[in-house]
């Protein structure tokens, strides 16, 4: 008994001494740890470590729903050492930073349509590219008709902030001409006369925009990126539509939005039970202009896509345990890999190869 008592007292004294010791040295220990973190993360640039090829980084796989694990819709495309962003959902600029992809490397932004959840994070992208990259000209922002109105609106909202930063840091650090964005609108052919148009062709990269069906939102487009024998399609928001299948023929990765109606109907019912009738109606409405995981899988199979990645996940999935319920019967329609997109995922397609490599950056 005495031995046991001594052991307990010794353990308590050791714990107390350790606590006192840690408390005494907490400040220098924390400073040292923070110094190491700063050294590791400042200037981090994963693009420099990637092989030549086409790469897809998911900087936002969420939707307008609150979701602690997913930012708003955003995909980063890296072609060789060039960086492009598709859609700029809220929080996605921070996610890009977590992934070690510097906003200063952005050459252009592409918007699929002008729903708020696809554009509400564009301000931080424009600001970070300008502030870190010291660009002399605004960020090009490509999109269908109306993109210049959207970009000009954000510029108007940020114009005071731009002025403050130039005044504080000097025009040398923040060149006034580089602030904001420049809308680069493109027109799709009239319906029935072709659904696609090449919007960028440069240094081996071809970006093709194609019409999708997100009615009543019009225009709405997806994008196909082709580089050195590799290809990625990003649909943007759409219900099942033939143009996605047509433009995804033989694509390496099809990034398709997905909504699971069975789970959305749970929300619809609960909103009604809580007498939140407006939200219950919204849950019913969103069912008619999105694509189910099963439909996305069927599209991927018909197109001969090598891999299907689902994004714009509706409703939010708090745990991976919920993924099978979200996917439903998708595997019955497509026998190749299906990935429920998560923020921080990186897919690498080495040039002139058939490999698809996966990595989680954070």
Task: Write out the residue ranges for each language-model feature.
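Binuclear metal-dependent hydrolase catalytic cores
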Residues: 2-232, 320-355
């Amino acid at each position: 008994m005495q031995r046991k008592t001594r052991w307990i007292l010794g353990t308590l004294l050791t714990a107390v001494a350790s606590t006192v010791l840690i408390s005494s040295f907490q400040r220098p220990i924390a400073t040292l740890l923070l110094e190491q973190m700063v050294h590791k993360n400042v200037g981090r640039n994963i693009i420099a470590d990637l092989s030549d090829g086409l790469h897809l980084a998911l900087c936002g796989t969420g939707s307008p729903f609150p979701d602690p694990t997913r930012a708003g819709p955003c995909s980063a495309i890296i072609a060789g050492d060039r960086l492009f962003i598709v859609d700029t959902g809220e929080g996605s600029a921070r996610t890009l930073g977590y992934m070690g992809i510097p906003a200063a490397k952005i050459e252009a932004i592409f918007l699929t349509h002008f729903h708020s959840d696809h554009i509400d994070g564009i301000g931080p992208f424009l600001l970070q590219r300008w502030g870190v990259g010291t660009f002399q000209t605004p960020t090009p922002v490509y999109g269908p008709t109306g993109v210049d109105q959207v970009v000009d609106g954000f510029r108007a909202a940020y114009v005071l902030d731009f002025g403050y930063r130039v005044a504080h840091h000097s025009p040398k650090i923040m060149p006034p001409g580089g602030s904001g964005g420049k809308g680069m609108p493109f027109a799709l052919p009239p319906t029935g006369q072709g659904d696609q148009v090449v919007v960028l062709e440069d240094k081996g990269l071809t970006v093709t925009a194609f019409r999708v069906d997100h009615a009543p939102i019009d225009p709405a487009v997806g994008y196909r990126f082709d580089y050195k024998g590799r290809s990625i399609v990003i649909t943007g928001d759409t219900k099942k539509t033939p143009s996605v299948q047509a433009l995804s023929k033989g694509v390496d990765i099809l990034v398709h939005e997905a909504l699971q109606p069975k789970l959305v109907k749970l929300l619809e019912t609960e909103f009604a039970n809580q007498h939140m009738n407006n939200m219950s109606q919204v849950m019913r409405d969103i069912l008619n202009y999105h694509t189910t995981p099963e439909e996305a899988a069927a599209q991927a199979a018909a197109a001969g896509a090598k891999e299907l990645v689902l994004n714009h996940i509706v409703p939010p999935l708090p745990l991976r345990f919920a993924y099978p319920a979200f996917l439903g019967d998708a595997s019955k329609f497509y026998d190749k890999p299906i990935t429920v997109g998560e923020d921080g995922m990186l897919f690498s397609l080495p040039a002139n190869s058939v490999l698809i490599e996966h990595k989680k950056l954070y």
